[in-house]
Amino acid sequence: MSQKMDFDAIVIGGGFGGLYAVKKLRDELELKVQAFDKATDVAGTWYWNRYPGALTDTETHLYCYSWDKELLQSLEIKKKYVQGPDVRKYLQQVAEKHDLKKSYQFNTAVQSAHYNEADALWEVTTEYGDKYTARFLITALGLLSAPNLPNIKGINQFKGELHHTSRWPDDVSFEGKRVGVIGTGSTGVQVITAVAPLAKHLTVFQRSAQYSVPIGNDPLSEEDVKKIKDNYDKSLGWCMNSALAFALNESTVPAMSVSAEERKAVFEKAWQTGGGFRFMFETFGDIATNMEANIEAQNFIKGKIAEIVKDPAIAQKLMPQDLYAKRPLCDSGYYNTFNRDNVRLEDVKANPIVEITENGVKLENGDFVELDMLICATGFDAVDGNYVRMDIQGKNGLAMKDYWKEGPSSYMGVTVNNYPNMFMVLGPNGPFTNLPPSIESQVEWISDTIQYTVENNVESIEATKEAEEQWTQTCANIAEMTLFPKAQSWIFGANIPGKKNTVYFYLGGLKEYRTCASNCKNHAYEGFDIQLQRSDIKQPANA
């Protein structure tokens, strides 16, 4: 018996991707859309990540949508980089201005999404058991939104305050407390720097030392802000037509083509200017691809660590042993933090955590660190984490967690073979860039594709196995041209025990990605299996 179609499209997620998908499909294609988010409000990843020090590493005026020119002009810009509360405020403004919340059911986690081949519908079930159907499923589940909780003996018996940075409660006080932080990645660097001046004592449990450069989060003058707003179109166009979408001068100069003195001067200027992506990509064009160039960048940052950190033994612990080939970090005084009398650094690679007890952390050498609060800045099961945790089933009941057992695959980071009419925003093997421009690019491609299916009486559209395999191999080939796979990083899944170390991003840049997506569309969706509408199948509302 044929099922009733409740909606044309169901959108999962209330962040940058989900909000824009709702707007495009509902307001421009005039489809009947229902969206869900487990949070109480919009903002996606930024709704959950409320830890102290939360900050983008993208300049404020570029961490936004390009399509709402009016809102761009009214945007309150105070500093070069935008803090978490201001990201939430901005997305609230977008949602309210465009009345997007009326399409959302908040406080509602989607438990399962199953594809019904007989009716060519997605059947979505919420945590409350409510069931809905739709022709199209858009998953904007978040790149960094599936928390990675450390698997440490005894962690659940800790009787002090235990927090993961991605599930941060309101009104946490550090006053008079002995605080421990596990993790020194991008989140750890931010929270450590913010908490150190507030806590009675802070112990940092470091597994891997990190390369980090100053963020340079300077206040902006009225003249600076006016210049930014007068040049929005140029800056945002620059993003869309660049590799990284950060509107920076992506260098093509080889590091070893200049003298040692000039190289040091270029690095020093970047250090003083601030910004992780600027340091890695605006200084020289081969830091991420040439070992000799990479070592020069490593040595410069290590020299800065030695200059900044007063205790040579602590400075040595903070010296990274890996390549400078992870997502580049930046900070607001991270290395200086270890000059404070109330901060202790524990190298848990050399002296592992044995157990967490009711009141602290026991180390292998017998030391015991008493704590009132333990913060897990241990990151995320990134990119595919939320997909394999959700019950998503495609054709023939194929579970996505099984299909991706040996590592995720996709066509352009948007579609997956065996999962017709399902479109991902920031899915595996999408572009590695400043995220809002990539999100816009993908959502617009998804919207155009759905419009094509409606106008051409298409029942289902699905990436072919060949196109998916070719794209995944392309991503792997490009990654192998860089040094990134040689470093232990979350961008290849190395932060999750047991997770296959594989490619999770397209490293060819946003400009080339947009060209690939455009070529696919302009060549009648080459790489897709397209099935025309059957007479007994209900069509979308505006068909």
UniProtKB/Swiss-Prot annotation:
BP terms from Gene Ontology: catabolic process
Listed Pfam families: FMO-like
Cofactor(s), by name: FAD
Enzyme class, UniProt record, top EC level: oxidoreductase
MF annotations from Gene Ontology: cyclohexanone monooxygenase activity; flavin adenine dinucleotide binding; N,N-dimethylaniline monooxygenase activity; NADP binding
Site (Transition state stabilizer): R327
Keywords: Aromatic hydrocarbons catabolism, FAD, Flavoprotein, Monooxygenase, NADP, Oxidoreductase
EC identifiers of the protein: 1.14.13.22
Keyword check for DNA repair: no
Reaction equations catalysed: cyclohexanone + NADPH + O2 + H(+) = hexano-6-lactone + NADP(+) + H2O
Residues the entry annotates as binding FAD: F16, D37, W46, D57, Y63, V110
Family, similarity comment: Belongs to the FAD-binding monooxygenase family.
Full protein name: Cyclohexanone 1,2-monooxygenase
Organism: Acinetobacter sp
